């Protein structure tokens, strides 16, 4: 039996650049550090459900447009 693990992925960078927001601007909008935004974009950190929803609102995206499992 294969040991498959689902990975939580995101399209945060694409959505952010589509809006022409820098990491710093988005971070300020949602109340986190620029490093947190960078870590989420690179998959080093998974946002809490609350932060994920705040990011969706800030970027005018549905949850499933920003976050998915692979």
Regions found by a protein language model. Name each.
Residues 50-65:
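DNA major-groove recognition helix of helix-turn-helix/homeodomain DNA-binding modules
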Residues 1-2, 67-70:
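Short, charged recognition helix plus adjacent turn
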Residues 17, 28, 57:
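Alpha-helical residues within the helix-turn-helix
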Residues 1-18:
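A short, Lys/Arg-rich alpha-helix, primarily the initiator
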Residues 10, 20-21, 47-50:
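Residue-level signal for the short linker/turn that defines the boundary of a DNA-recognition helix
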Residues 20-38:
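Short alpha-helical DNA-recognition segment
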